[in-house]
Regions:
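Short, solvent-exposed loop/turn and secondary-structure capping segments
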Residues: 30, 112, 179-181
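Thiol/selenol-based redox catalytic cores and closely related redox-interacting motifs
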Residues: 43-118
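C-terminal/domain-terminus segments
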Residues: 113-131
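Structural microenvironment flanking redox-active thiols in thiol-disulfide oxidoreductases
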Residues: 1-52
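Extracellular/lumen-exposed scaffold segments
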Residues: 126-293
């Protein structure tokens, strides 16, 4: 389980971890033993805490209720509950997601998805929150204009995994690269240009806040990055049955593309650059073994 694998890193960041489920103590105990889980698993077998947090999946009950044959209900079940159809055993489940809670019990951020099979990884959440990570499976490079380190948030993914390809960039002395908004003035914004994989979709790049650079010769004010920064290219593994079938025949997925940017110093704007990059992540299949409730 990915969360267990990141437990030590989370603790180093001063974070505690707990997971809550509608399952019984016995079911959670069986799961923890099989998967080597050492952090607290909280049994909310009447779903009272889940309901109090406002994340009770009401579609699960609709799927076995009087309107179970309604096409709209069946479509909702496939999206929010299970691709395998409704089942009374699923009633009481929460919408899957992550809450970040401070020491006073206040929710400071939350991460939830519409499609029940899509899940943010722990390290993806940490990157989104700006927490430092030690790059894994990193690709390092240097050009005349900048240094970069590119790495995936996770080295293994499964059906529906939402993860990121991170790019740490350090512009050279007196250099800057362009941030979103600079394209309006004809400059190339730094970013990834990933080839579309068969079993995943590519989300928009997430950029940090930029600064405004004044280029006196042209009397221009342009958004740029001059200090070290990180951009995130999010990738979401497809969660449908066909994607799962394809993944079952593969051991790994290689994502290929280019790092695109244009750099300038205080006097010269250099030609746009395109640097080939690739990332390989292992593929794992979901664990559907379940103890009886």
């Amino acid at each position: 389980m990915e969360l267990q694998g990141q437990l030590e890193i989370l603790r180093e960041q001063g974070l505690g971890v707990a997971a809550i489920s509608y399952d019984s103590v016995d079911v959670l105990s069986d799961f923890a033993q099989r998967r080597g889980i050492t952090f607290p698993l909280l049994a909310d077998d009447d779903s009272s805490a889940i309901a109090e947090f406002g994340i009770l999946n009401t579609v699960a009950a609709e799927g076995v209720g009087d309107n179970a044959d309604d096409p709209d209900v069946q479509a909702d079940v496939a999206k929010y509950v299970s691709a395998f159809g409704a089942n009374p055993m699923i009633v009481g489940t929460p919408y899957p997601g992550t809450f970040m809670i401070d020491s006073d019990g206040k929710v400071t951020s939350r991460f939830f998805e519409e499609f029940y099979r899509e899940r943010n990884t722990t390290t993806n959440v940490m990157l989104k929150l700006g927490m430092g990570l030690s790059p894994i499976a990193a690709v390092e490079g240097e050009t005349a204009h900048l240094k970069f380190t590119a790495y995936p948030s996770n080295t293994s993914v499964t059906v529906g995994t939402r993860f990121s390809l991170a790019l740490d960039v350090t512009p050279g002395p007196n250099m800057h690269v362009y941030a979103p908004g600079a394209e309006d003035k004809g400059y190339r914004v730094i970013g990834f240009n990933l080839d579309q994989p068969e079993i995943a979709r590519i989300a928009p790049v997430t950029y940090p806040e930029s600064e405004i650079y004044y280029f006196e010769p042209l009397d221009e004010h342009v958004p740029v990055y001059q200090e070290k920064f990180t951009i995130l290219q999010e990738v979401v593994m497809n969660g449908d049955a066909r994607a799962e079938e394809v993944m079952s025949t593969l051991d790994a997925l290689t994502l290929t593309g280019t790092l695109e940017y244009q750099a300038c110093d205080d006097a010269i704007c250099f030609l746009p650059q395109s640097i080939p990059v690739s990332f390989t992540v292992d593929l794992e299949m979901p664990d559907r073994q379940r103890a009886n409730r």
